[in-house]
Amino acid sequence: MRTSLTASLVAAAFAFAPLAVSAQGAPKGPPPLPEGAGKPLVEGMCAGCHALQLIQASSGYTRDQWRELTGYMVDMSKSPAQQNEVLDYLAKNFPPNNARPAKQVPGNFQITFKDWVMPQLGQRTRDPIQAADGSIWYAGQYGNLIGRLDPKTGQAREYPLPPDSMPHTVQLDPKGRPWFSGNKNGTIGWIDPASGKPTVYKMPDAEATDPHTVTFDKRGIVYFTFQNANRIGRLNPDTGEIKIVKAAEQRTQPYDIKFDRDGMLWVTCNARPCLLKVHPDTLQVTEIKLPTPGTTVRRLDIAPDGMVWYVNSGAGKLGRVNPKSGEIKEWDSPSGPKSHPYAIAVLDGAIWYNESGVRPDMLVRFDPKNETFQSWPIKSGNIYAGILRNARVTREGTLLIHQTATNRVMEVTPGPARGGEAISLTR
């Protein structure tokens, strides 16, 4: 399915609401786009899917680069005059800039990126995960779909979800079924890959409208977070029983959720300096306070030795909790306090994460043995655009990542340097 310029403008007509007004009558939100020919088209085309401040906060691009980037979002080929007007406006008002510079750390480790562009334009591909047969499932949040990629052929099949699901993630249960979180319509569900038929569970709590991240125990019981609803949930798919508890009385924004080796759940706090430890049977919550002021945590991963590694997104750090001793240690991320680390995965004794708050989005490798960093820019075609929001490890020891703005699923193969460039890109 391709999204045309006309369809984007029609969608924007319904989505483009007036700015909120404060008591003093001044509009809230980011400054308006610069005046000029093309502004109405850009507002109409872009605002139907994402906030206009994403354009203003971008690293800027040349005209050819804007052509490539917008080409992942909407098909303007049948409206060449309007396309030229849009590209001229974007290139003039948002040329390349260095407002959020990344700091690349050199080293002697080589990685190779391989990428695939998913079919539906503007879907914001995210959260790829490997299935038992080697295929890769992913969520297309803005496309209201989940998809299945055959990495051998590059072909993908995409499955439409019930209206307004807006899947925030896809996760596989012990039976290999792909589950999605209905982040906009308060549902959890799974798809039958053969028929495409969804099985959907509606949340019984009227305030639990945004299921977020999903995980499973060995029995297939589903556990999940609600970021804005400030809750944690559990679903028994066999009985349909759902239990939901508040994560805390304070605004916490539970985000990521994973099991440790002892069968306890760990949950990240995206609104304040904490992690949550949750008993899977009772859903009793124990809070672990983190030391750095301004800490917010997007994601975590559990190492084979039981250590809990997390990204301190709010303060630009990488952190580690020793569950046995309670010791907490943090390291400054290379690109600084505004680098906003996001996704994280433990792979082959190293910690891999990204710095989403800088441009380009940086993939970072941390060696805990000698406490050293190395980093690489994540490239999307001929541009640097998009954000990595989740990372998963494959059975072959590679890393599955993505870039939302360019609808890409990516595989990172790590290995020792053998000379040549620090990064090689293959397609």
For each predicted feature, which ranges?
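A short helix->beta-strand "capping" segment at the edge of beta-propeller domains
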Residues: 103-122
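Blade-level signature of beta-propeller repeat domains, shared across WD40, Kelch, NHL, RCC1
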Residues: 385-427
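C-terminal capping alpha-helices of c-type cytochrome domains
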Residues: 75-103, 399
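Conserved beta-strand positions in repeat-built beta-propeller and related beta-rich domains
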Residues: 136-142, 178-184, 222-228, 265-271, ...
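Beta-rich, blade/repeat-based domains predominating
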Residues: 121-133, 163-175, 206-219, 250-262, ...
